Amino acid sequence: GAVGRRLKGDEGGKWGVGYGVDLAVPVNYTSNVVVKQAYAEGRWLLGTLTVGAKEYPMELKNNELSSGSQTLGRNARPIPQVRLALPEYWTVPLTRGWLHLKGHIAYGKLTDGDWEGDFTARQTKYTEDVLYHSKAGYLKIGNEDVFCPWSFEVGLEMASLFGGRSYLPNGDGTMRVYNNGTGLKAYLDALIPGGAEANETQYKNVEGDQLGSWVMRINYENDDFMAAVYADKFFEDHSSMFQLDYDGYGSGDEWDVKKDHKYLLYDFKDWMLGAEVKL
């Protein structure tokens, strides 16, 4: 069952308060009660602050028809988090109503550490107390106040898993424990990818698991019908994010020295495409 109060109940005022609890009682499952949602949230003007686990709609897609999103989808239960958001498009001043933006930033914590340990029987790699970060920003070009049926939306969605304790087998039945960063620097490295893993030495990358999607949507709408096409381009790491990676390192002892102005262009794949028509 579920109980709650939506923020829209205070629509029109400067302030708003909402909350929700949604529970399920499964059969033949690992838990007797499943908390689907449990959150409290507040709004001041256009900004919202949400604390807890809440389901969020997908952006730039039809939530009733789409099969999902490649980064911030709905195919898993929500992660407990603190989320600061501008959930609806805000019109940028001095753009004559043509440019709008929205987005969010959030930090949370995964709750499946015990399950990972049980599932792996603590014999293969697993991690406990993993922290979570997500952020997204969207721009819309269009003006509903003038006769222009076209609009264009583009956005960047990113998520990261970081922190916690990683357990790796030694081969003799014992486990090595790596305490990943959980301080302020780790949170900043999740926000702006940087740092390195606790067990990395020579071949260092950024800290945590960094992934995301470029999303875009083109809309045409008049009094008779609406049509739209959208795209979701998944990436993991910086090189995949920009489809380009440096490829001019030396060899031998100069394996990590930049020698030439050479770059590698990755294949354009991992796209999800869709179309929508309303009559």
Question: What function would you assign to each model-found segment?
Answer:
Residues 1, 31-36, 76-85, 129-135, ...:
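Residues that define the transmembrane beta-barrel architecture of outer-membrane proteins
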Residues 2-5, 38-42, 51, 82-88, ...:
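Residues on the lipid-exposed face of transmembrane beta-strands in outer-membrane beta-barrel proteins
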Residues 4-17, 43-47, 89-103, 140-153, ...:
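Short loop/turn motifs that connect adjacent beta-strands in outer-membrane beta-barrel proteins
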Residues 22-26, 67-72, 120-125, 200-204, ...:
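Extracellular loop and loop/strand-boundary signature of outer-membrane beta-barrel proteins
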Residues 152-154, 162-279:
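Long, internal scaffold/assembly segments composed of regular secondary structure
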